[in-house]
């Protein structure tokens, strides 16, 4: 039997992605949005779609989306900008609750 050559396993690089909310004039145009990123959610009633796109080419993509005829406005998600360390908030809330209990 031939010996099996060991191939080098390349690491999986996770690209940074960001949420983009695209508000449309009608529901018909939302099918075309899959060209620009991964369509995660589409609302027929509110006429908006949620896309996830790579963070690298965000500025070019936003200008392309705004130029489409059926697009009303484009918003970028801000979850990366928020502080996701909630331990301090919990500690402050616990102190406030303890102070209220002591007052009673």
Swiss-Prot record:
Chief location bin: cytoplasm
HAMAP family attached to this UniProt entry: UPF0298
One GO cellular component assignment for this chain's record is: cytoplasm
Please state where this protein is localized.
Cytoplasm
What UniProt keywords apply to this chain's record, in alphabetical order? Cytoplasm
| Source taxon at top rank | Bacteria
The scientific name of the source species is Lactococcus lactis subsp. lactis (strain IL1403)
Q: Which family does it belong to?
A: Belongs to the UPF0298 family.
**What protein name is recorded for this chain?**
UPF0298 protein YdgE
């Amino acid at each position: 039997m031939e010996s099996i050559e060991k191939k080098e396993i390349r690491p999986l690089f996770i690209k940074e992605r960001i949420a983009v909310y695209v508000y449309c004039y009608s529901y018909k145009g939302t099918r075309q949005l899959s060209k620009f990123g991964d369509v995660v959610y589409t609302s027929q009633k509110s006429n908006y779609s949620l896309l996830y796109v790579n963070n690298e080419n965000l500025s070019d993509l936003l200008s392309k989306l705004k130029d489409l005829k059926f697009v009303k406005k484009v918003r970028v998600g801000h979850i990366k900008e928020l502080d996701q360390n909630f331990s301090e908030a919990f500690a402050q809330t616990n102190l406030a609750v303890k102070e209220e209990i002591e007052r009673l």
